[in-house]
From Swiss-Prot:
It comes from the Archaea. Catalyzes the NADPH-dependent reduction of L-glutamate 5-phosphate into L-glutamate 5-semialdehyde and phosphate. The product spontaneously undergoes cyclization to form 1-pyrroline-5-carboxylate. The keyword Cytoplasm applies. Keywords: Amino-acid biosynthesis, Cytoplasm, NADP, Oxidoreductase, Proline biosynthesis. GO terms for molecular function: glutamate-5-semialdehyde dehydrogenase activity; NADP binding. It is an enzyme of class 1 (oxidoreductase). This is Gamma-glutamyl phosphate reductase. The gene is proA. Its EC number is 1.2.1.41. It catalyses: L-glutamate 5-semialdehyde + phosphate + NADP(+) = L-glutamyl 5-phosphate + NADPH + H(+). One of its GO terms (cellular component) is cytoplasm. It is found in: Cytoplasm. PANTHER family: DELTA-1-PYRROLINE-5-CARBOXYLATE SYNTHASE (PTHR11063:SF8), GLUTAMATE SEMIALDEHYDE DEHYDROGENASE (PTHR11063). GO terms for biological process: L-proline biosynthetic process.
Length: 449
């Protein structure tokens, strides 16, 4: 007999089959209803979040919750505005499902279509951030995927209220199957979800390194995501130092509690004496704790800086998610690239240089899902990449990589349109040859005639 959790997941799986065939206009109508519902229920959301924040502060004071998680938990009116605009941005995006990717004529009257289609049922397990619910639900809905959500206990009230507001809006929209979106709330349900590989097609974990690694290590379901966000900026000998100051400051300080914030600053030794003093001053003004290798420590020590320490080997492997930064001097761009590929997490890394040859070298050799040239690592984000929003950032090398929007929530199927055709015609002693000619026709035009 199925458990309550399995029953909910089965219901979502059945709904995913129906949702895959819902037309774009119906999905867009549902998304607009979701946006309006969030706007109309602001006070309810803020009240629920206030209760979560009070409990989170207590847990932080007891050492059970980090400041980074508390920061991610907070919902404000501007954040609700962001949720609403994010949903409406998804409405503007092209429906990724049902698109003809390629068309190939195998023979006259025998045409093969490669067509995008929803993955099916997505499981989203996340910590702290309540804005994950509208963000991911909108992307999954538009791409035709049903979704099972499991949020962290620290955001229980916020997640529940936001989820219920959105689901009620969907239930009032004709054409959207009921049960396509489910919310799980207890800690025990995580292990149950991880075991349901019979129904769930893809898992997307959003949270700390340990959290994501736990998910990856305890399920047979395919996992889209990244465990670490150890991002670097390398300041080259040919850098415009004014650009370097701005990019390095923004990459660390603009919002340090996220996975695309810089954790290690690499500086070419030739320019360190000129560059580092001003950079240290800017960081110290906002309270960034700095951890230096031997070479950079010697320079910082001359400045009389108080908030400095020597870096250890562990610092190069650490995602701080805080106002902490490790700094290292390197002798060449090759050494910088080697350090990034050894200690980085293949997430986002940047170079500051005006040299075209070094720019090309860095782009080609840094093995990361996003590579920035003279720009902040903080740009590695689905919204900023024009995806409307993102379901997560993937450092995988198959299916989807980097900030993953709706294009990462579809796969494809092959559809062959024939007229009683047989393989026997194209086999044997006198086989008929295939034409294998590319065509411009779209499957949607054919089946909607």
């Amino acid at each position: 007999m199925a458990t309550d959790i399995e029953q909910k997941v089965m219901e979502a799986k059945m709904a995913s089959i129906v949702l895959a065939s819902v037309d774009t206009q119906t999905k867009d109508n549902a998304l607009e209803a979701m946006a309006k519902a969030l706007d109309a229920n602001r006070n309810k959301i803020l009240e629920a979040n206030k209760a979560d924040l009070e409990e989170a502060e207590r847990m932080k004071n007891e050492g059970k919750l980090s400041q980074a998680l508390v920061d991610r938990l907070k919902v404000t009116d501007p954040k609700i505005d962001g949720m609403i605009s994010g949903i409406r941005d998804v409405i503007k995006l092209e429906d990724p499902s049902g698109r003809t990717i390629n068309t190939l004529e195998l023979d006259k009257g025998l045409e093969l279509y490669q067509v995008s289609s929803p993955i099916g049922l997505i499981g989203v397990i996340f910590e702290s951030r309540p804005d994950v619910v509208p963000q991911v639900m909108s992307l999954c809905l538009k791409s035709g995927n049903a979704t099972v959500f499991k949020g962290g206990s620290e955001a229980l009230n916020s997640n529940r209220v936001i989820f219920n507001i959105l689901v009620e809006a969907l239930e009032d929209t004709p054409g959207i199957p009921k049960g396509a979106f489910q919310l799980m709330e207890t800690r025990e349900e995580v292990m149950d979800i991880l075991a349901l590989d019979e129904y769930i097609d893809l898992l997307i974990p959003r949270g700390s390194n340990d959290f994501v690694k736990f998910i990856q290590d305890n399920t047979k379901i395919s996992v889209l995501g990244h465990a670490d966000g150890i991002c670097h900026v390398y300041v080259d000998t040919n850098a415009d130092l004014n650009k370097a100051y701005d990019v390095c400051f923004d990459s660390k300080v603009q919002y340090p509690a996220v996975c695309n914030a810089m954790e290690t600053l690499l500086i070419n030794r030739e320019i360190a004496e000129e560059f580092l003093p001003e950079m240290v001053r800017r960081y110290e003004e906002v309270g960034v704790e700095l951890r230096f290798d031997e070479g950079s420590y010697a320079i910082a020590e001359k400045l009389g800086s108080a908030n400095i320490a020597k870096a250890t080997e562990d610092d190069w492997k650490t995602e701080y998610n805080d106002f902490i930064l490790s700094i290292k001097l390197v002798d060449s761009i090759e050494e910088a690239i080697d350090h990034i590929n050894k200690y980085g997490s293949h997430h986002t890394d940047a170079i500051i240089t005006e040299n075209k040859t070094k720019r090309k070298q860095f782009i080609a050799l840094v093995d990361s899902s996003s590579v920035m040239v003279n720009a902040s690592t903080r740009f590695a984000d689905g919204f900023r990449y024009g995806k409307g929003a993102e379901v997560g950032i993937s450092t995988n090398k198959i299916h989807a990589r980097g900030p993953v929007g709706m294009e990462g929530l579809v796969i494809y199927k092959y559809v062959l349109l024939g007229n009683g055709d047989k393989v026997a015609t194209y086999a044997g002693d006198t086989p008929r040859p295939f034409t294998h000619k590319e065509l411009d026709s779209k499957l949607s035009d054919i089946i909607n005639e």
